[in-house]
Amino acid sequence: MERLKTKIRDIPDFPKPGVLFKDITPLVGDPATLRLAVHQLLHPFLEQDITAVGGIEARGFIFGALVAWELGVGFIPLRKSGKLPYEVRSISYQLEYGSASLEAHTDSLGPGDNVLLVDDLLATGGTAKASCELVESLGATVAACAFVIELDFLHGRERLSDYTVHSLVHY
């Protein structure tokens, strides 16, 4: 996916010193590469019975909503704590320094749902793993996790060893 890589910009020392941020705004700003990314994210799952796409806040919303639209299924936002207005199911997880929570509406998924989780980037896998657990806590099944970017050196795929993982660009 070299074509996608040309539209991912490196921003050194953002959001803090020592971090090399992968900026996807050139990719999503270009219709051809955005379309390519969406089609490559969903392609392995066209023959699966996906009933919903879960997008992980925040950039997973960009790709997840487009993948859901292409598949003709609903989009489920997995949000940071306190961002959803209705009754929620919440899951807490550990970050490198501290903890965080993800939430989904309690009526968004249930038994029989087969969910494709989508995000822009797989790093350590903590947020993705929590997303899988949140989906499963609602009674649904995780079909797979799909990412535009995977930072291989952070070994996030290992935390997702119970799931199918599909990534387009590797660093």
From Swiss-Prot:
Keywords: Cytoplasm, Glycosyltransferase, Purine salvage, Transferase. Catalyzes a salvage reaction resulting in the formation of AMP, that is energically less costly than de novo synthesis. It comes from Nitrosococcus oceani (strain ATCC 19707 / BCRC 17464 / JCM 30415 / NCIMB 11848 / C-107). Belongs to the purine/pyrimidine phosphoribosyltransferase family. Its EC number is 2.4.2.7. PANTHER family: ADENINE PHOSPHORIBOSYLTRANSFERASE. Gene3D superfamilies: 3.40.50.2020. GO terms for biological process: adenine salvage; AMP salvage; purine ribonucleoside salvage. This is Adenine phosphoribosyltransferase.
